[in-house]
Structure formats: structure tokens, C-alpha cells
UniProtKB/Swiss-Prot annotation:
Residues annotated with N-acetylalanine modification: 2
Protein name according to UniProt: Mediator of RNA polymerase II transcription subunit 29
Organism: Homo sapiens (Human)
Subcellular location: Nucleus
Gene designation per UniProt: MED29
PANTHER family: MEDIATOR OF RNA POLYMERASE II TRANSCRIPTION SUBUNIT 29
Length: 200
């Protein structure tokens, strides 16, 4: 009985020593490594893409070659459709190859034109705001696309917000003063304010 117990314990210990790894089973699992950060050209390419998304002029320059290619395709498809319709009217056999639809090419061309128009409008609006900012607040403010290009005389953004709020308050005061003066001249009594802040 003791011999059989010794044999059973020896067999169990041998099985424990061999284990799943010795039998060809999977070993210890490796921990997943975190994704590598973008460095070098990849990071610069990402920054350039972000600048193109923010800058309407860069996006306009990027869309111009696409517009030229779309116009060439549109003219080519129009010529092919015209030739095919002429051959059909004359009773001749048309080409067996598939021909692109003219309306699809025209729709793509107009879509690119709409994008270019939006870019030009946005660029014009940015230029107008820049001119107004340079006129009423000549101190520079760091932009979101170039946060590192901070000059010594630049104005911090919180302080810039305070300046803008002061300008808005001054504009409201001027508007109220002009409205009171106009009411006194015409003899009208001013209407009571609709809320705590009043109405403009």
C-alpha cells in the first residue's frame, strides 16, 4: 500500500514538472506593448495636415490641381458622349466600351467649385478679421495653428478676451447713449428693458 502511494506521488510530481509548457502548450503570455508615438517625418506630416485643415489658402492650393483634373475629365466625357450621340443619330454603330456619365462628372466639378468658393470666403473673412484686429487691437495674439511662434510683445489669450469684452461693453454704452439722445430729440419715451441686461 505504501509502495503504491509512493508511485502515485512520484507520477503526480513528474506530471507537475512536465506541465503544459513541456508538453508543447502555450508559455507565459506577453503583455501588449503600447503603440509607438509619432516621431520624425510622421509627426511633421501630421502637423502639416492639421495646418492645411485650418488654413483655407493651403486647402485652396490643394484643391486647384483636383479642379483642373476634374475639368479635363468633364471635357473628355462630354466629347465622348457627343460623338456617341452623333453616331446614333446617323445610324452608325457606337463604341461598345462603357462611357462615363456626363452628369456625374459635372456634379463632381461643381462640388469642387463649391469647396473652392467656401475656401475663398473663409480666407476673405479671416483677412477682414485680421485687419479689424490689427486696427482695434494691434498687439499680437498667438494663433492655434502656430502656438510656438510667440513673440515677446504678444498678448496672452485671457487678456485678449478681457480687451474684447471691454470693447463690447463700450460699444453697448455708445449704442445706449445714442438711443437716449435720439429719444430725447424725437420726444419719445424709452421702452422698459425686456430683461436684466436690457435690449439693444
Amino acid at each position: 500500500m505504501a509502495a503504491s502511494q509512493q508511485q502515485a506521488s512520484a507520477a503526480s510530481s513528474a506530471a507537475g514538472v512536465s506541465g503544459p509548457s513541456s508538453a508543447g502548450g502555450p508559455g507565459p503570455q506577453q503583455q501588449p506593448q503600447p503603440p509607438a508615438q509619432l516621431v520624425g517625418p510622421a509627426q511633421s506630416g501630421l502637423l502639416q495636415q492639421q495646418q492645411q485643415d485650418f488654413d483655407p489658402v493651403q486647402r485652396y492650393k490643394m484643391l486647384i490641381p483636383q479642379l483642373k483634373e476634374s475639368l479635363q475629365t468633364l471635357m473628355k466625357v462630354a466629347a465622348q458622349n457627343l460623338i456617341q450621340n452623333t453616331n446614333i443619330d446617323n445610324g452608325q454603330k457606337s463604341s461598345d466600351g462603357p462611357i462615363q456619365r456626363f452628369d456625374k462628372c459635372l456634379e463632381e466639378f461643381y462640388a469642387l467649385c463649391d469647396q473652392l468658393e467656401l475656401c475663398l470666403r473663409l480666407a476673405h473673412e479671416c483677412l477682414s478679421q485680421s485687419c479689424d484686429s490689427a486696427k482695434h487691437s494691434p498687439t499680437l495674439v498667438p494663433t492655434a495653428t502656430k502656438p510656438d511662434a510667440v513673440q515677446p510683445d504678444s498678448l496672452p489669450y485671457p487678456q485678449y478676451l478681457a480687451v474684447i469684452k471691454a470693447q463690447i461693453s463700450c460699444a453697448k454704452d455708445i449704442h445706449t447713449a445714442l438711443l437716449d439722445c435720439a429719444n430725447k430729440v424725437t420726444g419719445k419715451t424709452p421702452a422698459p428693458p425686456a430683461g436684466p441686461g436690457g435690449t439693444l
